[in-house]
């Protein structure tokens, strides 16, 4: 599973986790708000800003009954038709260029999730550096082939997909030209609970499909994302908003700016902590060896006096013989007078 780049940023185990701030519909249909979200994401240290590219008409039909109406009382969007929800949540296509331009000015990558083939054509006209396939679209093989044919890196959320479905999607992507692929473990509930996140799947995904892996995290807070890095995640995606109290279609499970800054710093710290398999003192620990216990003279000893548990003891610092040698020393005679506080060495043991 080779590392690769999105823009100038390396995606892989030898680079810090690639953190994506997902705007979704948290702009609340205000371009000014959208641009402020971009600025806040950049200030928080996110590496990329992601949009979703669709219209209500490319997503569904304008019907407000039956399966086109959200009746689940536990849903964040209960009482809305699918069409009305997507009307509220979509990012107008004419906003994409100024949003992407502002992100670029701030040194941040920007790309999007297309939900149909027309969105891919539109995003190609804006020369996006990568694409994301949403979890509900990961079985849309024609869409995956369309994105793969661009030759750009592709990120796919796994959501509810079975191994067989993921295998079909990954094969389709690779056969159509995708060489740089990331699979994101994703739980398609909003919000998701930590218990349903199952991030132990992350290394299994990497093993099965030989690609970079990560997490699209819908849980509250940053704990699951940080843990995902320890499981091998090289990409972390989180929804982002300026203030959850302002509301918005996805605001309730989105990170605020200070939380995004924490996500960026703590996932990088987790990555730094991974290191490699290592035993023994590191270079940084060499000075700490002195704080080990070792054998010291704890009472003045005369020449010829025998060593006993009363005049030698294992204490700190660690400049004397290792404590494991005490049985070999006890009962033997001192070659010379030894002052209390002297580190014991073989040359004074008779």
Question: Whereabouts are the PLM-identified features?
Answer:
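Catalytic cores and adjacent flexible loops of soluble metabolic enzymes
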Residues: 1-350
């Amino acid at each position: 599973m080779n590392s690769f780049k999105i823009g100038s940023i390396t995606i892989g185990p030898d680079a810090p986790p690639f953190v994506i701030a997902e705007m979704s519909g948290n702009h609340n249909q205000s371009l000014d708000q959208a641009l402020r979200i971009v600025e806040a994401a950049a200030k928080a240290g996110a590496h990329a800003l992601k949009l979703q590219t669709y219209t209500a008409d490319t997503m569904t039909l304008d019907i407000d009954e039956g399966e086109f109406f959200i009746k689940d009382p536990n849903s964040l969007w209960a009482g809305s038709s699918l069409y009305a929800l997507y009307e509220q949540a979509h990012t107008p296509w004419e906003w994409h260029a100024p949003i992407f331009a502002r992100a670029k000015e701030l040194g941040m990558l920007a790309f999007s999730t297309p939900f149909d083939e027309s969105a891919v054509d539109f995003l190609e006209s804006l020369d996006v550096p990568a694409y994301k396939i949403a979890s509900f679209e990961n079985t849309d093989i024609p869409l995956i082939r369309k994105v793969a044919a661009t030759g750009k890196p592709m990120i796919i959320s796994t959501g509810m997909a079975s191994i067989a479905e993921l295998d079909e999607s990954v094969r389709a992507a690779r056969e159509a030209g995708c060489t740089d692929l990331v699979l994101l473990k994703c739980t398609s509930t909003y919000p998701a609970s930590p218990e349903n996140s199952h991030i132990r799947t992350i290394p299994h995904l990497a093993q099965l499909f030989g690609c970079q892996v990560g997490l699209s995290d819908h849980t509250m807070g940053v704990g699951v994302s940080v843990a995902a890095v320890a499981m091998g995640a090289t990409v972390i995606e989180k929804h982002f908003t300026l203030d959850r109290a302002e509301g918005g279609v996805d605001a309730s499970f989105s990170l605020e700016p200070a939380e995004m800054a924490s996500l960026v710093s703590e996932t990088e710290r987790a990555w730094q902590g991974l290191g490699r398999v290592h035993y023994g003192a590191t270079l940084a620990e060499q000075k700490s060896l002195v704080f080990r216990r070792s054998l010291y003279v704890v009472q003045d000893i005369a020449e010829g006096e025998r060593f006993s548990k009363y005049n030698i003891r294992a204490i700190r610092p660690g400049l004397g013989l290792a404590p494991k040698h005490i049985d070999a020393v006890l009962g033997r005679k001192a070659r010379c007078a030894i002052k209390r506080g002297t580190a014991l060495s073989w040359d004074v043991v008779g």
